[in-house]
């Protein structure tokens, strides 16, 4: 089980990562990582970066059957 400090240190080393990448790297369940990232965000230590839907080259994101699942969410330290 990873700690909040380990999540912060991993983000410091990698620059930016997705929550799923952090979960796999630290061998910690995704809901736990999501909670830790939200806590870091509330503390002002981490920032959530969401991709702009205008960046879709095909323009089909608006009609995507997966509900914009192709849009990625990154985390980085402040």
Curated annotation (Swiss-Prot):
Binding site for iron-sulfur cluster: 56, 61, 64, 70
One Pfam short name: FeoC
SUPFAM superfamilies referenced in this protein's UniProt entry, alphabetically: Winged helix' DNA-binding domain
UniProtKB keywords: DNA-binding, Iron, Iron-sulfur, Metal-binding, Repressor, Transcription, Transcription regulation
Family indicated by similarity: Belongs to the FeoC family.
GO molecular function: DNA binding; iron ion binding; iron-sulfur cluster binding
Name this polypeptide is given: Probable [Fe-S]-dependent transcriptional repressor
Annotated InterPro entries: FeoC, Tscrpt_reg_HTH_FeoC, WH-like_DNA-bd_sf, WH_DNA-bd_sf
Gene transcribed to yield this protein: feoC
Main function: May function as a transcriptional regulator that controls feoABC expression.
Organism of this sequence: Citrobacter koseri (strain ATCC BAA-895 / CDC 4225-83 / SGSC4696)
Superkingdom field: Bacteria
UniProt cross-references to NCBIfam families, sorted A to Z: PRK15431.1
């Amino acid at each position: 089980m990873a700690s909040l400090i380990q999540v912060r240190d991993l983000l410091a080393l990698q620059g930016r990562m997705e929550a799923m990448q952090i979960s796999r790297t630290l061998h910690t369940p995704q809901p736990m990582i999501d909670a830790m990232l939200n806590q870091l965000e509330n503390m002002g230590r981490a920032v959530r970066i969401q991709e702009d839907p205008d960046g879709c080259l095909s323009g089909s994101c608006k009609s995507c059957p997966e509900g914009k699942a192709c849009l990625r969410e990154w985390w980085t330290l402040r």
